Amino acid sequence: AASNLISRYLREYSQSQQSPPTPGIRPPTSSGTDAPLQEEPEDTGNTLVYLGFRCDDTQGLAQVLDALDANNKTGVFFFPADGLEREDDLLYRILGSGHSVGLLAEGETAAATRRLLEKGSQTLERIGYVRTTLALVPDGQRSALQEEGWVCWNETVNAVPAGSQTSASTHANAVIRKIGSQRNSAYLTLDAGTDSARVLPILLQRLGSRSYPISVPLETRL
């Protein structure tokens, strides 16, 4: 019965996305304090951009999803095990919108992180009826866990806003400059807090204006 209910929810949500879109988040208007956009090279070198969101802070998660839906973009959302149950409604929305779901685990050792990943994997399969090997783990543990079959997120750009004092325009400028130094692929990590929700519409706009393609993050392509 639970499986049928979730299947119906995902089907209804997917159908609702095919109707004419309604306005989502309105991009913040620039204020006089916003830094002007620095001119960037027009040639992006076809750098693929992947968007990852760590969901230990989910206060802005619904707004993050609104921004991605409005721009027809996808990302991967990394949840700690307890967050999967706490945000189950938004989890179903994420799955129904074509995003990927991964696990966030940060143990003191690789063994401790592995146990957290296993717990999260069981929780996700129980409430979401899906499995994943995508994981956001401490840098020093990534190689060991990859050898065990986990597909670990390799952050190349920390795109989490410094705080509410940083304007969306200034933040987007800084992220674009960091991407410019990447080759082939850039892995942007944001969180799902209110500040990330605030800056994301402008960041997506700037990525589009610079012709950076945002690729769909999959377990077979990260």
For the regions a protein language model found, what residue spans apply to each?
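Alpha-helical scaffold elements lining the catalytic groove of polysaccharide deacetylases
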Residues: 107-128, 141-184, 196-202
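Active-site beta->alpha N-cap acidic-glycine motif
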Residues: 13-119, 123, 222
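Charge-rich, solvent-exposed alpha-helical interaction surfaces
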Residues: 5, 9-12
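Catalytic grooves of carbohydrate-active enzymes
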Residues: 59-61, 171-220
